[in-house]
Swiss-Prot record:
This is Chitin synthase III. It is a multi-pass membrane protein. Glycans are attached at N37, N94, N558, N802. It comes from the Eukaryota. The lineage of its organism: Eukaryota, Fungi, Dikarya, Ascomycota, Pezizomycotina. Keywords: Cell membrane, Cell wall biogenesis/degradation, Glycoprotein, Glycosyltransferase, Membrane, Transferase, Transmembrane, Transmembrane helix, Virulence. One of its GO terms (cellular component) is plasma membrane. It is an enzyme of class 2 (transferase). It comes from Metarhizium acridum (strain CQMa 102). Disruption phenotype: Results in cell wall fragility and leads to delayed conidial germination. Also leads to high sensitivities to heat and UV-B stress. Impairs appressorium formation, affects growth of in insecta produced hyphal bodies, and alters the surface properties of conidia and hyphal bodies, resulting in defects in the ability of the mutant strains to evade insect immune responses.
Amino acid sequence: MNTGDTPCKTSLRVTTWVDRSLHHLKLQTEFCMNMANRSHSQYHITPQDHDEDARGYLLNEPPAHGYDHDRLGVGTPPDRPVSAYSLTESYAPNASQLPPAGSGGFGDNGFGQYGQPQGFGGPYDRPLSAVHDEEESWMQRQQQPGGVGQAGGLRRYNTRKVKLVQGSVLSIDYPVPSAIKNAVQPRYRDVEGGNEEFMKMRYTAATCDPNDFTLKNGYDLRPRMYNRHTELLIAITYYNEDKVLLSRTLHGVMQNIRDIVNLKKSTFWNKGGPAWQKIVVCLVFDGIEKADKNTLDVLATVGVYQDGVIKKDVDGKETVAHIFEYTSQLSVTPSQQLIRPTGDSPQNLPPVQFIFCLKQKNSKKINSHRWLFNAFGRILNPEVTILIDAGTKPSPRSLLALWEGFYNDKDLGGACGEIHAMLGKGGKKLFNPLVAVQNFEYKISNILDKPLESSFGYVSVLPGAFSAYRFRAIMGRPLEQYFHGDHTLSKILGKKGIDGMNIFKKNMFLAEDRILCFELVAKAGQKWHLTYIKAAKGETDVPEGAAEFISQRRRWLNGSFAASLYSLMHFGRLYKSGHNIVRMFFLHIQVIYNVLNVIFSWFSLASYYLTTTVIMDLVGTPVVASSSAAEHHGWPFGDTATPIINALLKYLYLAFVILQFILALGNRPKGSKFTYIASFMVFGLIQGYILVLSGYLVARAFQQPISEQIKLDSSEDFVRSFFSGSSAGGVILIALITIYGLYFVASFLYLDPWHMFHSFPYYMLLMSTYINILMVYAFNNWHDVSWGTKGSDKAEALPSANVTKSEKNEVVVEEIEKEQEDIDSQFEQTVRRALAPFKEVEEIEKKDVEDSYKSFRTGLVVSWLFSNILLVVIITSDNFNSFGIGKSASVRTANFFKFLLYATAALSIVRFIGFLWFLGKTGLMCCFARR
């Protein structure tokens, strides 16, 4: 048989870990002949009639003739050729290709629907559709089988006794489903035949603080156990993102690892062992309570997680983190397609070493980083650690570009890539002004801000969503200072921890990544610097609603402001570093630049208001011709109406600024969503009006030829006329060039100008809201620092690991040992859930009672305050002269005081009459009262 380079060759390789019978080889050969002419598309192939065997294999359903009984257990499928079959067809709910429930070889073994044991006392004794609550369904799946089933009947499982490491550390290897281990390419199984890396998943219940997760205490990780050098540790931090966001990040990371493994001319990766063995991917989930349980199904499909494994405590000692380890070649795309290897194609994903850390309680992102650096980092000792937030999608070869920055610069301590907003298919999200504004903000930061700071050698913030650090550079003081913000260390650190911090320091740790950046550059005796790497790109979601946008920026603005002051106050520590005189010179320039930025930020509220009013006055106030000024008429509504409209807009501007203070001091953004949307609209309309007036002002300034305004006779005349002449031409030219021109020039030089056309107009309209709404809310909520650990009711219902003594007086845990067919059957359920089409649940905001009370209070205060302000303005302002309520402000003031005096007198007379009536009535009653 000569089929060329087909999957048949791969399937017929003799593996070292199993002895296949000749009968199986014959079946595989026949199957391969049918598969030889099929397309090798990686993602999807329309199922044909002869795909039935492949579909049955992927579903772990044996053929009618059954399988030989080998050491992998009854019903284990033979090693089939790897196809490009899309498991969405097989596992999607109500798929037409599915066989009837209970059919196949498993039905002969007493298995009922979906191949589950009859009478099984767990969540599988009824269809999952009956379990409406996702959380409840997940909790049921964690219970240990083997007891009396709720449906009646008794299912007995074999048990095994697992010895605890050093008498206290529970670490167990669990067999993975057949479909997962059979998906691994034989060439990797051959190489790794001496261990169980692809055969079993390792689970460790960590009952200690991250600082105590050490070899000395009995904890270990597979890459070190296999004596592998970890060059690159890629960390994905997760909070509550859905399975699409997690898959987007995870699949992007695996594709980037493939880029590294496929390097042909590398002088590093192709030496000293396979490249994939030098890379570890670590997922850290911040608590069971907040995690989307569908993401756990995705990880279980990849092989990194299994239901029914985790233990809430070991011998009464609470588990702090559940750690899973497995090496997999599987991935799930954001569109819920399962990616498997196809033959020996270079497009196959290489094996990826996974560490999945599921923290039992929510204890914030900084604690997740403590698990990463202090626990896993100290054991693996990587050269470079890359940090990625779940939801951020790294572009092709981006992780390689980040690593190359460290490889080519021995003094590089940290780096970040370009983060840009996810704009949706065809850029449809740009129709949302908030998304467009943030897109422009990200772009300009990547084009102007990051390159400038990178030139100085100190990037003020390496965003945690997409950045990298040299591990040995941040060890020591940088990490120690960084982790002072971890509230789980408050008891250990005492006054140096969160409990001993003032409100300024607590806000500083809202942007703790800025603290790490400064501490890294200022590290004593070292000359580490930070840089921006243009070739590394990451795509992330941005808030699309006003409430979410405001809440996000509160933390960013307060944290960055406090951290900026921290770096300025501690600038003297740079003199203890090892930077040379040239670097120190540029760092001094940078600190002056940062001081000016802080000052301008502090006075930005007044600056925006003064700019608005000055432009209105320049354009709207009519000017009579004189020897020093030309005649100007009020524009655009004429000499009479323009000043009145401008005055109303000024008052409206002030009113909405005051409204922001009232909202910020008492209301949640989600509780006042529509008020904030109205505020964005009002400030946007006023800013649009100002832009129109500015355009008119520019046109009016250049009515006089520029040659007459700016003298070119000599350099002295040019400087005098340009900067201090009576005309405004020079000043306007400076403004146009620095505000608009530089953005366009820099964007075109960067070869990325498109944001200037689709996002810049939105930014021009809403730029005042960054101060009037975002900064006002942030500063008014300076006290809002949320740190507390949130406990988990879900964790309380998890099973425990009860310790006993063996015959040899060893500390052991008795663990249920499932048969392979049970594992495969439950895996079928898992993949069904993982590959089901994602349906985004629209969050229905229900205003709670407290929000309704706060909204009423806000309305009451606003009505009271603004009505009083309106009265004062009407009485004292000359802008209301033409409304027929008085010839001038002085006349209205006099009339108001007359009215006030007469009204006060009248009310006093009424009170006096009432007094006389009461007095007379009391006297008369005294005379006629009975004694």
